[in-house]
Amino acid sequence: MSREKKEKRKRAVPIWVGVLVFVLAFAAGVMSKSLIKPSWSKEYSVEWSDEIGTLKTDISYGAGEANKFDLYLPKDNSRQNYGLVVYLHAGGFTTGDKKDDTEMLSWLCSKGYVACGINYTLRTDENNGSVLAQSNEIKEAIPVVISEAEKNGYHIDKMTMAGGSAGHCLAMIYTYRDGDEAPVPVVLTFGAVGPSCFYQEDWGIYGLDQNDENCAGMFSIMAGVEITEQDIRDGSYHEKVKPISAMEWISNNPVPSVVAYGTCDRVQPYLGALRLKEALEKNQVDYEFFELPHSGHGLQNDSAIQKLWMEAVVEYLDKYMPVE
């Protein structure tokens, strides 16, 4: 077979196929995660009630239809300072809602934190949304969240960014990229299975490592900028995806981190998670990295390790966000 024919065959898969596979895989990962809940997980989820505090919903932070957040205010409003925990929802950047995390946010509020779930504009074929745009919406929201807490008598002096999957990705971006500009110190980030970087060679789960055209198309959608095949070939795409690559910003704001990843993940590449671990180590971050060797994106096959991860989350919250 001639080189020209090989090249044509190599480029035969349309970009939209790769994008569709990515979205469907993310959705499947989210579904598996939500359906499979071990018994111990009840320790970290609480059904909301007025005994916990006050819930304020759908507070606007911007002009977009999705630019709204829910604020969970603990019943004890007598303390001088409060820690804020923002937990961002999963959904592959295309689905999901802040209400999906009501039990997690209620649990955080029951521990004495001001908790917040933030919606962001989900990508559709019509709006050409991107991870970059979503990360900028989160950056826009944080000062409004803190201001709203202050209006209700809760002075925020520190905060934690957290989330699952896509939400974890956005939480890490804010922590490492934008945290040094936050209204209050970001002292901790935690989450699971969020993509932290975009290296072509890591994304073999979608065949992007073998197809420059599809890789350029996928990364363009994620980054919200045009990335060409030539950019992929000569490596210049790295600068274009840097704004959405949380790992690349750790040196900017090396915040304590607790993360969990499945080695069998077919939604976001585990190779990228290893890059995150290396960066955390290199920057001497106080971190815990939990590797789940039998699990995919839902972390469903390593319950004991998943429990250790959540125990570490509590330990780090107590250490860096003590309720006093």
Regions found by a protein language model. Give the residues of each.
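N-terminal Lys/Arg-rich, disordered targeting/topogenic segments
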Residues: 1-13
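Alpha/beta-hydrolase superfamily serine-hydrolase fold, recognizing
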Residues: 11-324
